Amino acid sequence: MTDGLVRLRLDLSYDGTPFAGWARQPGQRTVQGDVEDALMRVARLPAVRLTVAGRTDSGVHAVGQVAHVDLPDDVPLGGLARRLNGVLDRAVRIIGLAPAPPGFDARFSALSRRYVYRITDAPYGAEPLRRFDTLAWPRPLDVPAMAAAALFLVGEHDFAAFCRRREGATTVRTLLRLDVLRRPEGVVVADVEADAFCHSMVRALVGALLAVGEGRKPPQWPAAVLHRGVRDPAVTVAPAHGLTLVDVRYPPDPELAARAEVTRAVRIPPTPSG
């Protein structure tokens, strides 16, 4: 850490409904923009920059988002989270705020991100209090078939067929878990964890599983799409509002810096020469 600065870890929860995603964009309301503006106001700083574990898309929620920010070490930290929550819209809450351990990087130190996607196939749709975080599906879903299809996708693969490509960036990811189950209240939940996700990957995976769940495709189909390595027009990206980032996992503090170094080497595209 540069002399004169302190790195803070922020744990955040937000309703993604009113936001055009996490990342600051000109002319758009975003979670990053709201939190950075609140930090500048409360800490009386001309500029701040947040680094986040998971850049959620427009309409995606979070209950376990993690970010870091570097602030001058003379900024009073006592009551900072309370003061931030006092100026932030109620759609965003700072759940925790504390000095980060040495070597911590919210993005690159992370071991994994975990998302949950909620679906209801009840004939009456989503419960009124859950309509903003649960997809109402109009047809019955075969959850055992969806769960069987999910098993073929777990592991290290090139997920290019389920990602929007970014020039120079890898689409190889390690999918640690993709569990699909029906909870006692009837809601179908896809529980997804990976070392990292490329753009639209979780929602594309859910879209493929929905095609299996309603019987349009066999359980082996998502894996066949995966191995072909190109987008299939039959894979629809599931709507954003059913998706919530629930957890970001980190190694023990002494391993944070080493993890960040390894991840940077894999995730950052090389700078073009010439």
Swiss-Prot record:
Biological process annotations from GO: tRNA pseudouridine synthesis
MF term (GO), any: RNA binding
Active site (UniProt): 57 (nucleophile)
Keywords associated with the record: Isomerase, tRNA processing
EC number: 5.4.99.12
Enzyme's top EC category: isomerase
Highest taxon of the lineage: Bacteria
Binding site for substrate: 115
Swiss-Prot/TrEMBL catalytic activity: uridine(38/39/40) in tRNA = pseudouridine(38/39/40) in tRNA
NCBIfam families on file: hisT_truA (TIGR00071)
Function as written in the Swiss-Prot or TrEMBL entry: Formation of pseudouridine at positions 38, 39 and 40 in the anticodon stem and loop of transfer RNAs.
PANTHER family the UniProt entry points to: PSEUDOURIDYLATE SYNTHASE, TRNA PSEUDOURIDINE SYNTHASE-LIKE 1
Quaternary context: Homodimer.
Homology family: Belongs to the tRNA pseudouridine synthase TruA family.
Protein known as: tRNA pseudouridine synthase A
Species of origin: Frankia casuarinae (strain DSM 45818 / CECT 9043 / HFP020203 / CcI3)
Gene: truA
